[in-house]
Amino acid sequence: MHIDILTLFPEMFHGVFQSSILNKAVERQQFTYDLVNFREYSKNKHQKVDDYPYGGGAGMVLTPQPIFDAVEAVKSKRNSKPRVILMCPQGETLTQQKSEELAKEDHLIFICGHYEGYDERIREHIVTDEISIGDYVLTGGELGSMVVVDSVVRLLPDVLGNQQSAPQDSFSTGLLEHPHYTRPADFRGYKVPEVLLSGNHANIDSWRRKQSLIRTWNRRRDLLDKIELTDEEKITLNTDTPDEV
């Protein structure tokens, strides 16, 4: 996979791509990336990339020319048909399923904006996806794109050391993830559930599934509307106040 990030502040990304899992993935060439300052594509003599909105109003709007030209330039370098992702609060909210969908692509282009917004023609004519990371507004699209890139890259083959890690994450099954425990088995009197020490993998799997169901019921009940439950699981959740662990 190759990722192009169009931004006015490429320096914001250096720490992200030089740390942790993303850095290892870059070193192993499991994905490549380019940071593109779309100001460099402005044909304005002062390299302006924004202007006042037609019809009046507060703030400045990103002009279409620099972004159109930047997107077309990075497309031509790879001769590809990439997904062009606009980070904006009006987009669809990022989900694990969306990340899994994007992880199947060969080329992603992220557009990170600033100011009041984008000229609508950018949305209409070059963007394939609009993504938001939540119902709040940031100063720019950079932080949001970092979140999306991280959630996508970790799903690429061999990026995570344990290939079972990603499929078992929260939301991958439609449920929140079950609780985790490690050594010691007894810490300050707080004990690990006996079933996890039993070595009976069928019982462990059953316990984990039940805990995922109960945790989802208690914390994100809306997610249960999107999955099919067995009769036994429905009985589990029909108790008055199911408790975790």
Curated annotation (Swiss-Prot):
Main localization (coarse): cytoplasm
Recorded catalytic activity of this chain's protein: guanosine(37) in tRNA + S-adenosyl-L-methionine = N(1)-methylguanosine(37) in tRNA + S-adenosyl-L-homocysteine + H(+)
Record key words, sorted: Cytoplasm, Methyltransferase, S-adenosyl-L-methionine, Transferase, tRNA processing
UniProt entry tagged with the keyword S-adenosyl-L-methionine: yes
Residues at which S-adenosyl-L-methionine binds: G113, I133, G134, D135, Y136, V137, L138
Known EC number: 2.1.1.228
RNA-binding listed as a keyword: no
UniProt record similarity statement: Belongs to the RNA methyltransferase TrmD family.
Assembly notes: Homodimer.
Function: Specifically methylates guanosine-37 in various tRNAs.
Protein name: tRNA (guanine-N(1)-)-methyltransferase
Lineage: Bacteria, Bacillati, Bacillota, Bacilli, Bacillales
